[in-house]
């Protein structure tokens, strides 16, 4: 039955009805507002999975993109690493596994939208974060709005655009959005300058993004680019080597984004909250219908890399728990970093791994070749257990995304917990404004409808079974439950004629609703 559902998923994903193999007769309109993305006015809850095309042999792209699609991924994200394509100044390589255009054509064939993370700085555990060594000899400050560095960035973007031209969303192509730089903490004007360069060259996409962490020194004007967030179950970059160090445990508790773990950085909405505070005072940009930015992620840890000094071993439950918690906390786009591992390409002058002997991003020593990341799909496309455990969640997001997207999160249990806190069950509710009754929202969702999210899991801690738990949403009390240790679930309330269920919705096909 699950195989039938997955086959059906691949045929019906709303985001993927754009292409017929050639330019689409009518390209769907993509907009955003304070809640979600909208495709032709319909709310969607996409699943974005990161794969680095230049870390995978070109002949394997089609097979691996299909696997991602079958896992429920509806948007591909990929970095364009500058030093993978211009390791030597002026010599651009778009051959073999570096051929961005060929990769985009594969995604178009598989009807998978693509978010390009353009750099110039990417990180991705690549040497110098992707910036070629020769750039460090130019005598300019990197990642700032000075003419020299912006001139280099423009040359890079022009080269990338030669690969993208004709494959943008407006052309019926797969490229739906672009991210500028990565994990930037400087002045917002630099990110805006990168966007203006891209627009001048010819980039014309439905939306643009940036990482919402760390906090910028000066803001980006509201509406220019969506801030996207993240969380990780563990991090190779920590200086300590003890298990459970840092604030990663926060990723396993329902909370507003400002309570996010961030792996040493606040990857929640610290910066986004500042943006949203300015929203009411800002002119409404095209595609924005008021309030604030939507809560999206681009770096929800699908696994974790290992460094020489710190080698976290993740469990399949880690990724599933974080994903469910983020969804229950109000996120309407789950973006995994990574969803598919890979292998560093060979360089001409240097190895391409992050290492302490490089002129930039030199805090950690990463493996020379492997970038498996313990992702749902590993370095060679092998499936790890969480590839399968995440699929039902992705099916749910696809089939009930339009119902879920306008629902706000509320938190009956405390948002601030200490590591290993086991005093009470962790749960959250998503409903329309948290109100009871039979009113409907503008999208037609009944205000008496809700989803109850439950997470009784935390990495490194065996949380106890919770007995006689009384869950309630929209005035409807569920029977008292016993929640086993490690249990993670989503219970519907007043959804599709179901008053409530102590089982999780998976999919609906041909008038039938499937639960597990």
Predicted region positions:
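C-terminal segment of classical bacterial N-terminal signal peptides
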Residues: 15-23
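Acidic-and-aromatic substrate-binding clefts and catalytic sites of carbohydrate-active enzymes
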Residues: 53-59, 85-86, 90-95, 184-188, ...
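Bacterial N-terminal signal peptides that target proteins for export
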Residues: 1-10
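Active-site region of glycoside hydrolase catalytic domains
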Residues: 109-115, 122-272, 281-306, 328-331
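N-terminal carbohydrate-binding accessory modules
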Residues: 24-75, 105
């Amino acid at each position: 039955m699950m195989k039938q559902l997955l086959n059906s998923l691949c045929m019906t994903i709303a985001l993927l009805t754009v292409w017929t193999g050639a330019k689409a007769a009518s390209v769907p309109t993509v907009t955003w507002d304070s809640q979600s993305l909208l495709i032709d006015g319909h709310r969607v809850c996409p699943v974005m999975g990161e794969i680095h095309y230049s870390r995978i042999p070109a002949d394997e792209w089609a097979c691996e993109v299909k696997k991602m699609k079958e896992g429920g991924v509806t948007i591909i994200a990929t970095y364009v690493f500058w030093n993978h394509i211009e390791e030597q100044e002026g010599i651009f390589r778009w051959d073999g596994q570096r051929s961005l255009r060929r990769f985009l054509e594969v995604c178009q064939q598989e009807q998978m939208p693509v978010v390009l993370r353009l750099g110039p700085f990417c990180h991705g555990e690549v040497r110098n974060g992707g910036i070629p060594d020769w750039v460090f000899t130019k005598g300019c400050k990197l990642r700032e709005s000075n003419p020299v560095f912006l001139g280099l960035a423009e040359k890079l973007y022009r080269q990338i655009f030669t690969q993208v031209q004709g494959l943008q969303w407006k052309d019926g192509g797969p490229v739906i959005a672009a991210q500028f730089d990565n994990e930037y903490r400087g002045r917002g004007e630099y990110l805006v300058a990168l966007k203006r360069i891209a627009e001048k060259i010819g980039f014309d996409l439905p939306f643009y993004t940036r990482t919402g962490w760390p906090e910028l020194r000066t803001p980006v004007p509201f509406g220019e680019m969506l801030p996207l967030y993240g969380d990780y179950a563990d991090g190779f970059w920590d200086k300590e080597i003890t298990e459970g160090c840092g604030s990663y445990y926060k990723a396993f508790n329902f909370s507003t984004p400002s309570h996010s773990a961030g792996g040493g950085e606040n990857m929640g909405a610290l910066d986004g909250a500042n943006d949203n505070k300015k929203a009411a005072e800002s002119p409404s940009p095209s595609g924005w219908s008021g309030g604030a930015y939507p809560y999206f992620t681009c770096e929800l840890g699908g696994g974790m890399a290992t460094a020489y000094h710190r080698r976290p071993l993740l469990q399949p439950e880690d990724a599933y728990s974080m994903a469910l918690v983020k969804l229950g906390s109000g996120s309407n786009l789950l973006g995994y970093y990574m969803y598919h591992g890979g292998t560093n390409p060979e360089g001409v002058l240097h190895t391409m791994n992050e290492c302490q002997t490089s002129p930039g991003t030199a805090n950690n020593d990463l493996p020379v070749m492997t970038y498996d990341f313990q992702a749902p799909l590993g370095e060679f496309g092998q499936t790890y257990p969480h590839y399968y455990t995440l699929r039902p969640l992705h099916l749910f997001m696809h089939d009930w995304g339009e119902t879920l997207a306008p629902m706000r999160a509320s938190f009956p249990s405390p948002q601030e917990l200490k590591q290993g806190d086991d005093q009470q069950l962790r749960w959250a509710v998503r409903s329309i404004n948290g109100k009871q009754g039979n009113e409907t929202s503008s999208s037609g969702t009944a205000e008496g409808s809700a989803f109850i999210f439950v997470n009784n899991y935390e990495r490194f801690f065996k949380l106890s079974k919770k007995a006689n738990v009384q869950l309630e949403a929209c005035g409807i009390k569920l029977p008292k439950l016993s929640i086993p240790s490690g249990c993670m679930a989503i219970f519907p309330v007043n959804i599709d004629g179901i008053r409530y269920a102590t089982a999780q919705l998976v999919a609906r096909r041909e008038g039938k609703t499937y639960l597990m």
